Amino acid sequence: MSTFLDMLSGSQCVSLEKCGDVVVSTNDCMIALYCHFCRDLFTQLPEFLRHLQGAHSDVLHFTKEHNVYSVEELMSGEQEDAQSVGHNSSSSDSRGLAKSEDSRATEATEDNSDNSPVKSEEKGSQNEINLLAEVTNILLQTKEKEHINDKLKPENGGFKGPRKKANSESNSLRICNLKSHTIARTSRKRMSIIKNRILRVIDSDLSANHEMKPSEPNSKILITEPIQEANIPGICLETPPKPIPSSSNLSVRKSSLTEANVSLAHTNYAAKKTTPTLPKLLNCAPKPILPSQQAQVHSGSSGIHEVYHISKAASQVPKEMKSFPIEITQIDVFPPRILPETSTTSDKEEDVNAPVENNTRSLYNAQNLPKDKPKKFFKKRGELWMKNEGKITKSKVNPIIVKQVQTSNVKSSPGKTQIRSSDKTKCFASEFNSTKNRKLKMENFIALKKEDPCSIRSIRLNKMATIGNCEILKVVGLPAITDNQIEDTLLQDELETMRKKADQFSKIYRKYDSIWNYRKIVPPGKPEHISQKMFALTREVNQTMGCNLPNSAIKNIINQISVWHYNIYTKNIVLDTISETARYTLNLFSFLPVSFAYFCKCCDDIFTLNEDYIRHLVSQQARYQCTKCIKTFKYQGHYDKHMRTVHP
């Protein structure tokens, strides 16, 4: 390259001067021309040449002007010009210098054009070439834009492109605007409510203050109008008069009348001064019945006062005016009605296996009985008294059972007392009216309310221990727990068999430590687990001992054994007073702890305190209890079915 430059520099035709360097960008593979004079970068050669001629002509001394566009420059268009401007890194000072130098160059060209006519002709031809080039450039740009738009359009004309969203940021409501909007909305609602209230009050005041207009003095008033004119209130103690029919409405049959004398009295218009006597017709006091009726009619058109005298027919009934208020002349007091008998007592005697009602249940119901329903109390009281006697019989002396007695209303309504009697009502009246019987009944009622089924501990233990009567304990060989004199009634062989049964039961019961050691196991077993163990114990006892005991009977036996062992340990039962069989059973159950739990025979509940267990027994809804297996039932039908199937 250096030799080529030397050759060119040696010749006189060619003079070369180094104006810049070629710079290559490795990032985007772009080539730029670097100017040595002003240190600017240019991406295209024509721009670089124009820059040298315009800005550095004083240094380089050009002989020809470079004003001809190249093909690349014509094809590039406005995009390449914008791109070249982006790649230029000339400072504002250099651009200012370039503008000043361009202005100087233009001035120099103008001076030269004034001096030489040849240059002016060349300049005109160059301007024409520049205009043609600009026109062609504009046409090419428009064609390129249309070609690009055709490419961007899809084949199907249904697609409209992405929707242009309007700039709604300025119109959107902010939080403060939303708050003010809600405040204004609520205030408008409140103001509308207040406005409606004010309007309603005004309307009500107007309707209250509204009065009827008084009639003119010369106006003609009918008989019924004085009531409306005087503003008489709607509620009046006097009955209004009946309207008198007009002359046109009067129709008289000749057949129904015996005599018809009609007299017409013509009076002047001034005779109407007698109208103040009209309000006298409003007095509704009963008047004596006259043989004829007098009707006065005021004609509105002619102003004639007409009076008709009509005689009564034979078939007509005289009508009397009703007076108010009604006068009561006589009050008849009727005797109280005697109601028929509601029900009678049954004549059947109780069977031996009849259900025994739970005493604790009846006592608890009597204690918590409401005051307004003494009906159930007296009924249950009578049933308990009769069942304790063992049978129900008719009594000639006292055959009556009171069904409902209210002490507060005995004097006021004695006739409303409902009774159930098998004898005549005279016997009931003589006994019910006696103060002695009523006093005894009230004393029994007060004593029964004061009685507490859980007050005395020994009574509770005795009740619980005597539920099964010894018959269930005989099945497992443990009757000595409740009866100390059982040895005197049994033979030696029977005693030995009873001890064997007790030994078998104690061995089986020893296996189920989760039942008899419930309070010492930590954590205690769940009721579901204990109930499963209880069913397993019942099944094993029935299989080994050849009996048919229910689950409730096994629970009853366990409770009695635990209470008996606890009483001996706490010295409530002296060892010297018990029999040898009881001592033998005590040795069999020596593994039992002092603390034990109560198992309810009706459900799966377990209690550690005696008071809670007794309270639970009282609250049980089972009223009927079998005397053989101590199983309880809520309804008598279930009890009867049990007796037919289990104890035939």
Curated annotation (Swiss-Prot):
Keyword set, alphabetical order: Cell cycle, Chromosome, Chromosome partition, Meiosis, Metal-binding, Nucleus, Repeat, Zinc, Zinc-finger
Record SMART domains: ZnF_C2H2 (SM00355)
Annotated Polar residues bias: 85-94
Region (Disordered): 76-127, 146-170
Zinc finger (C2H2-type): 33-56, 598-620, 624-647
UniProt-listed InterPro entries: Znf_C2H2_type
Compositional bias per record (Basic and acidic residues), positions renumbered to this chain: 96-107
Keyword Chaperone: no
GO biological process: male meiosis chromosome separation; male meiosis I
Domain of life according to the entry: Eukaryota
GO MF annotation terms: zinc ion binding
Family affiliation: Belongs to the Teflon family.
Role description: Specifically required in males for proper segregation of autosomal bivalents at meiosis I. Expression is required in the male germ line prior to spermatocyte stage S4. May have a role as a bridging molecule maintaining adhesion to hold autosome bivalents together via heterochromatic connections.
Remarks, miscellaneous: Drosophilid specific gene duplication generates rgr and tef. Teflon has a function unique to Drosophilids.
Name recorded for this polypeptide: Protein teflon
Organism (species): Drosophila yakuba (Fruit fly)
